[in-house]
């Protein structure tokens, strides 16, 4: 089965390519910009292509030249921090590109199309204790979540109107390699871990923040399971642990992974709710029922794996001190 992965140099897309390559799956990896030598060398069996997926003619030409069986559509303007300043660009990327790929899938009768979406389509669900099941009605409140919901609706339309095996898998607050960031849109785990490894004491607010954090390897594993399952019986799936983890739990996991880390939190949710509102955890049994997949990393195991990767790549984050 030849798998098309869009957004293949991104956070989740890159991990999907990595895992698919380890399974010896034929992979066509698409990115908006030219792929560097490092990516090409890291994935020697992958066919790398450059394409602006919002360009209908370019997408049709690419898919006509390359036989494709399934697609995991990871390319996106990935959060509100990037979407709000450029709504037209967010619409073109998150909605237009999805429409182009779905039409290509219809014309070529692809076996499977998986759209990666987000828990942000539940922006209006502020009860952090109540799990959000797949059949709950979305409620969007910003540019990013609106464009992703539009993409979901298009995916469902091609499923119901044209018989395409197309489904949406929603993910939430993904963390892990290769992200190195202390920016609020990435959430507390990358920020805490980076500063802890740099021996920077963390004393700040945010203790009341909670989210359904998912380690990147688990997100990619679940998406591959959806792409390769014999049948997807539902239009919507949720991928995650089904619970929210507090910022305090994230801090404890970082302290365990980085002995000696100082993280002391006071009340509030900022800065983590600057671009994303609090919401309940994504939950549901559909993905496990249809694919057999469950996330394999606990919060602590995911943070430890992330810390190990960062220690192995100090050149990416070092600020004059060696991590412990």
Where are these regions (language model features)?
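Rossmann-fold cofactor-recognition segment
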Residues: 43-55
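A hydrophobic alpha-helix adjacent to the NAD(P)-binding/active-site core of NAD(P)-dependent oxidoreductases
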Residues: 48, 90-91, 105, 113
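Active-site helix of classical SDR
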Residues: 143, 147-150
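Conserved Rossmann-fold NAD(P)-dependent oxidoreductase catalytic core, especially the SDR/UDP-sugar
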Residues: 73, 99-143
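N-terminal Rossmann NAD(P)H-binding glycine-rich loop of SDR-like oxidoreductase domains
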Residues: 3-23
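NAD(P)H-binding glycine-rich loop region in Rossmannoid oxidoreductase-like domains
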Residues: 53-93
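C-terminal substrate-binding subdomain of Rossmann-fold SDR/epimerase-dehydratase oxidoreductases
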Residues: 200, 204-324
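NAD(P)-dependent short-chain dehydrogenase/reductase
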Residues: 129, 156-211, 216-218, 224, ...
């Amino acid at each position: 089965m030849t798998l098309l992965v869009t957004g293949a140099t991104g956070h989740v897309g890159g991990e999907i390519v990595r895992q698919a390559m380890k399974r010896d799956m034929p992979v066509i990896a698409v990115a908006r910009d030219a792929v560097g030598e490092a990516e090409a060398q890291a994935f020697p069996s992958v066919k790398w292509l450059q394409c602006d997926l919002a360009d209908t003619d370019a997408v049709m030409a690419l898919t006509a030249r390359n036989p494709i069986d399934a697609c995991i559509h990871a390319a996106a303007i990935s959060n509100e921090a990037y979407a709000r300043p450029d709504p037209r660009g967010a619409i073109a990327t998150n909605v237009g590109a999805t429409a182009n790929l779905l039409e290509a899938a219809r014309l070529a009768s692809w076996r499977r199309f998986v759209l990666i979406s987000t828990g942000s389509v539940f922006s209006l669900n502020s009860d952090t204790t109540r799990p959000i099941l797949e059949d709950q009605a979305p409620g969007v409140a910003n540019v990013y979540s609106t464009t992703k919901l539009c993409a979901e609706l298009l995916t469902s339309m091609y499923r119901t109107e044209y018989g395409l095996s197309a489904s949406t898998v929603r993910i939430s607050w993904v963390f892990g390699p290769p992200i190195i960031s202390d920016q609020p849109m990435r959430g507390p785990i990358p920020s805490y871990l980076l500063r802890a490894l740099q021996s920077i004491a963390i004393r700040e607010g945010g203790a009341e923040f909670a989210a359904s954090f998912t380690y990147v390897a688990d997100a990619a594993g679940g998406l591959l399971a959806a792409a390769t399952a014999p049948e997807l019986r539902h239009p919507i799936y949720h991928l995650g642990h089904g619970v929210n983890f507090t910022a305090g739990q994230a801090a404890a996991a970082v302290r365990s992974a980085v002995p000696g880390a100082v993280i002391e939190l006071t009340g509030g949710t900022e800065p983590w709710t600057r671009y994303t509102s609090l919401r309940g955890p994504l939950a549901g049994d559909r993905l496990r029922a249809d694919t057999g997949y469950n996330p394999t990393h606990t919060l602590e195991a995911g943070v430890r794996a992330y810390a190990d990767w960062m220690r192995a790549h100090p050149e990416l984050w070092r600020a004059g001190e060696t991590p412990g």
